[in-house]
Amino acid sequence: MAARWSSENVVVEFRDSQATAMSVDCLGQHAVLSGRRFLYIVNLDAPFEGHRKISRQSKWDIGAVQWNPHDSFAHYFAASSNQRVDLYKWKDGSGEVGTTLQGHTRVISDLDWAVFEPDLLVTSSVDTYIYIWDIKDTRKPTVALSAVAGASQVKWNKKNANYLATSHDGDVRIWDKRKPSTAVEYLAAHLSKIHGLDWHPDSEHIFATSSQDNSVKFWDYRQPRKYLNILPCQVPVWKARYTPFSNGLVTVMVPQLRRENSLLLWNASDLNAPVHTFVGHDDVVLEFQWRRQKEGSKDYQLVTWSRDQTLRMWRVDYQMQRLCANDILDGVDEFIESISLLPEPEKTPHPQDIDHQPSLSHGEEDAIKEDPPSSLLEEKRSDQLGLPQTLQQEFSLINVQIRNVNVEMDAADRSCTVSVHCSNHRVKMLVTFPAQYPNNAAPSFQFINPTTITSAVKAKLLKILKDTSLQKVKRNQSCLEPCLRQLVSCLESFVNQEDSASSNPFALQNSVTPPLPTFARVTTAYGSYQDANIPFPRTSGARFCGAGYLVYFTRPMTMHRAVSPTEPTPRSLSALSAYHTGLIAPMKIRTEAPGNLRLYSGSPTRSEKEQVSISSFYYKERKSRRWKSKREGSDSGNRPIKAAGKVIIQDVSCLLPVHKSLGELYILNVNDTQETCQKNATSAMLVGRKDLVQVWSLATVATDLCLGPKSDPDLETPWARHPFGRQLLESLWGDRESTRVCGPPLSGARLAHYCQLRDVQTLAMLCSVFEAQSRPQGLPNPFGPFPNRSSNLVVSHSRYPSFTSSGSCSSMSDPGFNTGGWNIAGRETEHISSPWGESSPEELRFGSLTYSDPRERERDQHDKNKRLLDPANTQQFDDFKKCYGEILYRWGLREKRAEVLKFVSCPPDPHKGIEFGVYCSHCRSEVRGTQCAICKGFTFQCAICHVAVRGSSNFCLTCGHGGHTSHMMEWFRTQEVCPTGCGCHCLLESTF
């Protein structure tokens, strides 16, 4: 270590430190240099007398280090290394690690101690999270802020204890720690990554950002669309921070080819040239901070650390400080005299957070006169930073591309002349700005010749302009551009009303006028006739999916409403014409970035030949800056437009009655129903579903072997007919009304429970278990091979939905394509009522069964009555299983899905007999001949030409569809599937 003194600075060299970060404590006594092996503590009062070391064992460099800014905690500092933060304690010449903060999953990019609360520390990381820690409880962060992109910078507000700012690539977000769910404000600050962010020391709304895009920008987050001022540079800016005195700013550039390693001191109110340059470092300046001002001294010291391994302390005397406060220092007396006339500051989004400053005493005013760069002077200056500092700057930043407006500005005379052309009218106005503008002093407006509007219109325009200007200047905001836009909008509105009234005094008022001759207007001639019914572009939507997720999208974060929330949103393209008058703007963008879009707001930029349509509703916003850097000019045209909102996937499985864990634990053992119910009850207990434990316990009792039905129907009534049999099970499904949402109403159900809960998981599992319990021995499903009753079985096919023979249990034919019917029937067709009042599924789904032997019918009825599941509701039970199988598929439980779908009933192929009996396709009555004697309709209808078939015809024996022989032959020369679209492969099933 060596020390060199000069009149300007102190240089201390640390040859082997390899430090990557530096910080100065709040007392101005010590600086810490963070190396990979050691932390070096330097006494700034005697830097040449040596330094102390704190050893550390880590393979990661320290990314950020900072002392606690509070005097009572001045011996604490924090250092980030990879994914953790170490809290060090330095006292009595020795240091140690107090505790470690661990929570981030990626590298920590920045940290910052709270200005008002000594126990709070905020950290930002690439993992998209910003954590606020309380060092009294370091187990987990007290507040977590989440963003889509990782944060590179985080800084607490120096005036508001609840606000902080973070940078994400080129964007800045303002957060309120009391509302961590979303950011208070979003700013699209730069086109490239932001390297530095710093709050103004005397204004809670102002901050500066430095970026890779070769610029430093000054912002007021109350006006997120436009920066207050900009400092253009030739190279990227590494850091930009405010000085503790006056209105200064220090910047460090990213050197190109190691040529520029100086620090520049700027006057923030005059950015034409730096007021001082700190030259001396031979390599990149990594960090710089200010020492606390010593008692009795007006000098400040700037401490810098560079990659050349030198620590330098630069003295900033009173004369240099005056360079950063030029115009304010000259008007100190005027400021003191007019301090009582200053308007109240604008309310922040949370007025209760503002700390009201006490009034000044006479002694304090004397101190201000003696020492101009005081906090009150800076506060006055910071109030002015909310807007362009001078009228000339406002003139330079104004958007002169307002249609039909010409503005002649004279900054020296503090006035401007505005000329507006609208239809056949011309308005010329002189606007004069007082010396106090915009500090609660509104400009004056005066119409001058030539002005062609009436006196009544003049009075209305003057009132509107005065109201608009007063609203702005009360908040110390500039008002020229808002007044110009208001002038144009109102004038166009008056002219439109005048034209519509004079063109036809007996016609009804029309809100959309014909094109004006002087400039492009939007008419009702839309792109096409159907455009009038095109809905307005959707800004949000939501959908649930079967896997337990909610997928929704919102409007882009870069857009917000320009009107009150009560303003209706246009629902069609024709309603959009109301916005073309310029009186209302549906949306406006939050940023001036050229790559962004904003919604059309009554300022058409297209020619008269172009028509309005939904596709032309969005357009690129015109650049408002008069100049741009070379980088922006070359890349902005090719940069992709990003105006879409975010698509968010939310896990809502906790709100659903189905559980993935239950799907994994449930079993279906067809060989032991008792074991299945017992194990499923245990699984329900594991996930905390006590109601399901009771259900499965009841199922265990109901499936006991001692309750099994007898084979002889005369011995006893089956247990399923007992009140605790089928009726108890149906009480779990739901009543008639509640089950309509799940499918057809269940017969005999009395209580509404699991269908009301939409618990398809429990419904499907119970159906599968009791289906397995009630299956006849050796029969795979209740619709197994039919007994050989070809002589007396009637299987009627109709145009109603029926299963096909494609091998899939879920493939069904479309009822709309069936044009004819057929049956394989016996000679006798009689219907005998059931003694139990039951109807079989075959009767409901496949036609009517006729028995020649009453005992055979009685046995079949007994088989139905001994089932715990009502065969009449088989279709609904199958729907439960298919729905649950779809959920299992989305969960990735394919084996469990296959087990459940095994219990879906598959209807058998229809019996193919020899005799043919014809049923009418309209009234379903038996027909002899080509015409029905009951309804007088034709029996057959060709599936190709849809004309009644009288002569030669051919029909498929599987699906029953057909038609004229010539038509069928022509169709199946090139096709293989039935022409009705039922999916039947007729050529494979029968021969034509």
Curated annotation (Swiss-Prot):
Keyword Zinc-finger listed: yes
Region: Disordered, residue numbers: 343-373, 849-870
RING-type Zn finger ranges: 940-989
Documented activity regulation: The GATOR2 complex is negatively regulated by the upstream amino acid sensors CASTOR1 and SESN2, which sequester the GATOR2 complex in absence of amino acids. In the presence of abundant amino acids, GATOR2 is released from CASTOR1 and SESN2 and activated.
Binding site for Zn(2+) 1: 920, 923, 932, 935
Domain of life, per lineage: Eukaryota
Binding residues annotated for Zn(2+) 3, in chain numbering: 956, 984, 986
Composition bias type Basic and acidic residues, residue spans: 344-373, 853-869
GO biological processes: cellular response to amino acid starvation; cellular response to nutrient levels; positive regulation of TORC1 signaling; protein localization to plasma membrane
In-chain residues carrying the UniProt-annotated modification Phosphoserine: 564, 839-840, 848
Binding site for Zn(2+) 2: 945, 964, 967
Residues reported to bind Zn(2+) 4: 961, 978, 982
Compartments where found: Lysosome membrane
Placement of WD repeats on the sequence: 57-98, 103-143, 146-185, 189-229, 232-276, 278-318, 319-362, 660-706
Domain RWD: 393-494
Disulphide bridges: none
Listed GO MF terms: zinc ion binding
Zn-finger segments (C4-type): 919-939
Entry GO terms, CC: cytosol; GATOR2 complex; lysosomal membrane
Keywords: Lysosome, Membrane, Metal-binding, Phosphoprotein, Repeat, WD repeat, Zinc, Zinc-finger
Subunit organization: Component of the GATOR2 subcomplex, composed of MIOS, SEC13, SEH1L, WDR24 and WDR59. The GATOR2 complex interacts with CASTOR1 and CASTOR2; the interaction is negatively regulated by arginine. The GATOR2 complex interacts with SESN1, SESN2 and SESN3; the interaction is negatively regulated by amino acids. Interacts with DDB1-CUL4A/B E3 ligase complexes.
Family: Belongs to the WD repeat WDR59 family.
PANTHER family: GATOR COMPLEX PROTEIN WDR59 (PTHR46170:SF1)
Function: As a component of the GATOR2 complex, functions as an activator of the amino acid-sensing branch of the mTORC1 signaling pathway. The GATOR2 complex indirectly activates mTORC1 through the inhibition of the GATOR1 subcomplex. GATOR2 probably acts as an E3 ubiquitin-protein ligase toward GATOR1. In the presence of abundant amino acids, the GATOR2 complex mediates ubiquitination of the NPRL2 core component of the GATOR1 complex, leading to GATOR1 inactivation. In the absence of amino acids, GATOR2 is inhibited, activating the GATOR1 complex.
Identification of the protein by name: GATOR2 complex protein WDR59
Organism: Mus musculus (Mouse)
